[in-house]
């Protein structure tokens, strides 16, 4: 059901959706975040849609993975601002928190806003100087993240050693 929603929205915004499925029964959200990292770092995908019960554990786990910048949101404005301003490559959504009547439609609206944000220029109604300052701040954050983390290959090796 959720993947059908993702596919519909992706197609509406000229993107392709693929499901990165796992058959292991013993994986947790940390394992899923690592697999997301593999997919992005190996250029299998250019954006990840993910989530968990609250969405926050998945976001945190993804943000520990080198080269992943994962946002979180439950509203259209949060999704759009994350995509257009923070320019991350992953987005986490809560699939149990407040999930109920019409939740699938709310998720659809959030995804539309997210995909629209991926194609929007950041800060369309803000003076050019302010836009440049905010884009520079986003780039600074990305540079700091790269500096603070080991490269993905070393990270993956550490992960394998922890799992074994």
Residue map of PLM features:
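Short Gly/Thr/Asp-enriched flexible loops that form oxyanion-binding sites at enzyme active sites
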Residues: 57-70, 74-78
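Structural motif
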Residues: 46-50, 69-71, 88-92
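C-terminal binding/interaction regions
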Residues: 1, 80-164
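Glycine-rich phosphate/diphosphate-binding loop of Rossmann-like nucleotide-binding domains
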Residues: 1-14
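Short, conserved beta-strand edge motifs with alternating hydrophobic and charged residues
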Residues: 18-21, 48-52
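Short, structured active-site "lid" loops
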Residues: 31-48
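Gly/Ser/Thr-rich loops at beta-strand to alpha-helix junctions
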Residues: 51-57, 98-99
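A short beta-strand-loop structural module common to alpha/beta enzyme folds
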Residues: 12-27
